[in-house]
C-alpha cells in the first residue's frame, strides 16, 4: 500500500471531488438494472470521462480507470431472483481481472496480494442466481479494497438484510459503491484506490429510499443517510427519477454497527 505522489493525488482529487457542475448524461446499454430504466447521474462530470459501463446478467458496473474500481454497481432484486440466489449454492470464488477493460485501466489480482485488504464485492455473490452471473460477480471490476472486519461482518449483514427485505416486499433497486472522502487517498501498489467508505442505496417502489454508508475501517462507523446526502458526499445520484422530497428524507433503516462473524456473500 502506498500514499500517492503529489501530482497523481492532485489528478485523482480533481477527478473525484464533487464539483458544482451539470450532471453527466449517457444512454445506458442495460436499463433493466436501474429504477425506471434510468442510470445513476454523475453530478461530477469529471467522473464520466474515465468511466466504462459493463453490463452483466444480474448487475451493471460503472467502472473507473482512475480508481480502478467501480464507481457504482446497480442491481434490480426481486423476490424471484433472491429465491433463486438462495437456492444456488455453487459459489465460484474465482476472482479475475475483467477482460473487457484495458490492462492499464483495470485492477489485477497481483494488486491485492498481501495487501491486508479483502476483495470486497459491491454486487454480492449472494445475489447471483447461476454459475454465469456468480462468475461475473468475481470480476475485479466489481471489487474494491475493503477492510476484512467490515467486509466479512456488518457489510455481509447489510447484504443479507437487503435480500430478506426484498423477499418480504418483492422488489428493490440497489446501487452500491465506494466513497473517497478527505485529502489523503491511498492505493494498493499505487494503482487501486482504497475507499474511505462504502455505501449502499436502496429504493423500494411505493415505500421510499435511503442509504447506508460505513467507514472502511476495522471498527466501522455506520450512518443511515438520505439519498440527497449521499449525492452530496459522493457526487452520484443513484435514483435520478425520485422526487426531491423522497431524496431528502432520512429513512428509518436499521444500523449495522455490530460486527458478527459471517461469511461474505
Regions found by a protein language model. Give the residues of each.
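Domain-level detector for secreted/extracellular nuclease and nuclease-toxin modules, and
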Residues: 5-6, 13-265
Amino acid at each position: 500500500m502506498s500514499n500517492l505522489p503529489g501530482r497523481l493525488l492532485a489528478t485523482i482529487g480533481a477527478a473525484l471531488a464533487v464539483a458544482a457542475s451539470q450532471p453527466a448524461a449517457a444512454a445506458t446499454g442495460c436499463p433493466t438494472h436501474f429504477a425506471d430504466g434510468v442510470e445513476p447521474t454523475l453530478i461530477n462530470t469529471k467522473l464520466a470521462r474515465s468511466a466504462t459501463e459493463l453490463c452483466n446478467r444480474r448487475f451493471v458496473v460503472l467502472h473507473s480507470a482512475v480508481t480502478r474500481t467501480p464507481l457504482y454497481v446497480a442491481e434490480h432484486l426481486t423476490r424471484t431472483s433472491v429465491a433463486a440466489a438462495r437456492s444456488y449454492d455453487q459459489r465460484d470464488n474465482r476472482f479475475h481481472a475483467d477482460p473487457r477493460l484495458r490492462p492499464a485501466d483495470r485492477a489485477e489480482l497481483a494488486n491485492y496480494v498481501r495487501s491486508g485488504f479483502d476483495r470486497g464485492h459491491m454486487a454480492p455473490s449472494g445475489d447471483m442466481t447461476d454459475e454465469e452471473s456468480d462468475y461475473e460477480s468475481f470480476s475485479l471490476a466489481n471489487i474494491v479494497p475493503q477492510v476484512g472486519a467490515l467486509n466479512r461482518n456488518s457489510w455481509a449483514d447489510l447484504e443479507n438484510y437487503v435480500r430478506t427485505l426484498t423477499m418480504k416486499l418483492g422488489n428493490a433497486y440497489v446501487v452500491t459503491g465506494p466513497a473517497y472522502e478527505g485529502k489523503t487517498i491511498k492505493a494498493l501498489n499505487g494503482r487501486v484506490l482504497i475507499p474511505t467508505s462504502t455505501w449502499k442505496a436502496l429504493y423500494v417502489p411505493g415505500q421510499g429510499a435511503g442509504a447506508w454508508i460505513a467507514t472502511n475501517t476495522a471498527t466501522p462507523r455506520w450512518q443511515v443517510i438520505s439519498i440527497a446526502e449521499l449525492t452530496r458526499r459522493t457526487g452520484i445520484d443513484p435514483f435520478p427519477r425520485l422526487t426531491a422530497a423522497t431524496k431528502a428524507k432520512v429513512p428509518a433503516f436499521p444500523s449495522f454497527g455490530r460486527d458478527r462473524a459471517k461469511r461474505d456473500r
